[in-house]
UniProtKB/Swiss-Prot annotation:
SUPFAM superfamilies associated with the record: Cytochrome P450
Predominant subcellular localization, coarse grouping: membrane
UniProt family annotation: Belongs to the cytochrome P450 family.
Biological process (GO), any one: biosynthetic process
Disruption phenotype: Impairs the production of neosartorin and accumulates blennolide C and 5-acetylblennolide A.
Domain of life per record: Eukaryota
Name of the protein this chain belongs to: Cytochrome P450 monooxygenase nsrP
Organism: Aspergillus novofumigatus (strain IBT 16806)
Role: Cytochrome P450 monooxygenase; part of the gene cluster that mediates the biosynthesis of the tetrahydroxanthone dimer neosartorin, which exhibits antibacterial activity. The two different monomeric units appear to be synthesized by the same set of enzymes, among which the Baeyer-Villiger monooxygenase nsrF is the key enzyme for the divergence of the biosynthetic routes. The pathway begins with the synthesis of atrochrysone thioester by the polyketide synthase nsrB.
Major enzyme class: oxidoreductase
Length: 515
């Protein structure tokens, strides 16, 4: 009987098979469309959905548009009666919030999880598949901190920073000495930033092997620069960036696993570096490897941007460069035993506490740079099954739902930062500080329940790099041939497709003294 059925089906030859193939394709296509078009039910008090969306995909503008005149976020806000709105990313329901009260709630509510928010940020897709336990609160810890946070804080202790300070200073000096006399800081400062991060937060073993360091660097750069907007909407969708990120992560895991396993096999205690410290704690090997992969991705993510922009700023705003130079000379004079030695040599005698507290002009420029360059949408996930009321409205963030806030709203507010597109570090001086007129008016270094856990090292790193750069060279803005560009200004391009892309600005370096 089965044979007869098959015979009848195959009568007509290729034509019948063509019809079967077409029918099968249409069935799969219709099933896929039915799945994509399925709209999950949402809480009745969710903010109204924005009309700015595409079939099946949802609001792709969330990931592709920043803050230009009529961008997606502004249009969605404008058509909302409350300033809050809902939108889809594929089949994920997301709530967007605006305003001071909602901003405070976004940063302080205990049910809103920072790490899970990474799942709808393009750069973080597939980095933790799923989110690893090292980023989850540890019930055995008194502080309830995650494994990742506990270990990161320990590696930034005064003892650790003092131990590594001489080498970190040497890394900065070597990195600055290797710069071309016409350079693009957005690219050229990467190697110094990454070398210091690896040394302090992972192991000297990698830094000592230039090929191994370069291999780690390439894989981390792949994770930093390769992502897909569409994978935010369709996490399961294969794409070139999906595979590149997976391969890079796999390579990093294997590289780090080799280092850890060699220590374990040798039996003898290794050098007192972060790898050995975590092994001495008898931490799980998987936790150790995952920690180092993650920290080497996270640490340089913003430092490379801020470091490159700070050097551009030194070349454009030469009045601020002179203020920074004066601070450097004052700090060196206060601690160097040889006042006649070259300034760059004197820097080696500055102790840790002075490196952290003796550069007020760098700190002002750093705050202004962070304000301008950390302007993008941020995300959290309501981990609870219960809705969270949105202050100032009758709306809620449903349970198990993502919520976003765009920091450009506050960072480029005319009332909090008069003439916000202007680079003006003096706005952070006593007597100004207009941003204090609202809760969380300055979002640099994180706020609320999620302050930046790497802030101590991040600030110290910028102080060291900028101090060596300015001590060694006079910086000025130029084009790629070295021709001066005196009309150059520092601008955060709000119309760019990506919020973290640095402008192609060049700088001319003139050595200040012979060493």
């Amino acid at each position: 009987m089965d044979f007869q059925i098959i015979s009848r089906f195959t009568d007509g030859g290729d034509f019948q098979w063509t019809k079967f193939g077409t029918a099968a394709f249409l069935a799969v296509l219709l099933s896929a469309l039915a799945f994509l078009s399925y709209t999950p039910r949402v809480h009745q008090k969710s903010p109204a959905f924005t009309s700015h969306k595409l079939p099946f995909i949802g609001s792709l503008g969330f990931t592709t548009e920043q803050w230009k005149a009529r961008n997606w976020w502004k249009r969605a806000t404008a058509e909302s009666k409350t300033g809050n709105f809902s939108f889809w990313l594929g089949q994920r329901h997301v709530v967007g919030v605006t305003g001071e009260a909602a901003r405070k709630m976004f940063f302080t509510h205990e049910a809103l999880d920072f790490v899970s928010g990474a799942l709808i940020r393009p750069i973080n897709i597939h980095f933790w598949p799923p989110i690893h336990d090292i980023f989850r609160p540890d019930s055995k810890s008194r502080s309830k901190n995650t494994y990742f946070l506990r270990r990161l804080y320990e590696l930034q202790s005064t003892e650790q920073l003092n131990h590594y300070l001489p080498q970190l200073l040497k890394d900065a000096r070597v990195g600055m000495a290797g710069l071309s006399r016409v350079t693009k800081p957005s690219v050229s400062c990467w190697e110094t930033v990454f070398t210091q991060d690896v040394r302090l937060l992972c192991t000297d073993e990698i830094v000592a092997d230039s090929k191994l360091l370069a291999t780690f660097g390439r894989q981390v750069e792949t994770l930093l620069f390769t992502f897909s907007h569409y994978n935010v909407c369709f996490p399961w969708l294969p794409s070139p960036s999906y595979y590149k990120r997976r391969q890079a992560r796999y390579a990093l895991y294997n590289l780090m696993e080799d280092i850890v396993n060699k220590r374990l096999k040798n039996g003898a205690r290794g050098p007192n570096d972060p790898v050995q410290i975590l092994l001495d704690y008898n931490d799980k090997v998987d936790h150790i490897i995952e920690f180092f992969i993650s920290v080497l991705f996270i640490a340089p993510a913003n430092s490379r941007i801020i470091g490159g922009q700070m050097l551009n700023i030194m070349s454009i705003y030469r009045d601020w460069q002179e203020k920074v130079y004066a601070d450097i000379k004052a700090a060196a004079a206060a601690h160097s035993p040889d006042k006649n030695a070259p300034l760059v040599d004197q820097l080696a005698f500055i102790p840790l506490h002075a490196w952290e507290n003796s550069f007020p002009s760098i700190d002002l420029c750093l705050q202004e740079t962070i304000r301008m360059w950390t302007s993008f949408s941020m995300a959290r996930l309501n981990l609870s099954p219960n809705p969270i009321p949105i202050p100032g409205s009758d709306e809620v963030i449903p349970g198990n739902t993502f919520v976003c806030y765009n920091s450009t709203e506050v960072n480029f507010s005319d009332s909090l930062y008069p003439d916000p597109k202007k680079f003006d570090p003096a706005r952070f001086l006593d007597g100004r500080e207009e941003f204090r007129n609202e809760a969380y008016g300055f979002l640099g270094w994180g706020r609320g329940r999620h302050p930046c856990p790497g802030m101590r090292w991040a600030k110290l790193q910028q102080n060291i790099i900028i101090a060596y750069a300015v001590a060694m060279y006079d910086w000025s803005s130029c084009d790629e041939t070295g021709k001066p560009t005196p009309q150059a200004v520092h601008v955060k391009e709000l119309n760019a497709a990506r919020g973290t892309v640095l402008p192609s600005a060049y700088c001319k370096l003139v050595p200040r003294e012979k060493v």
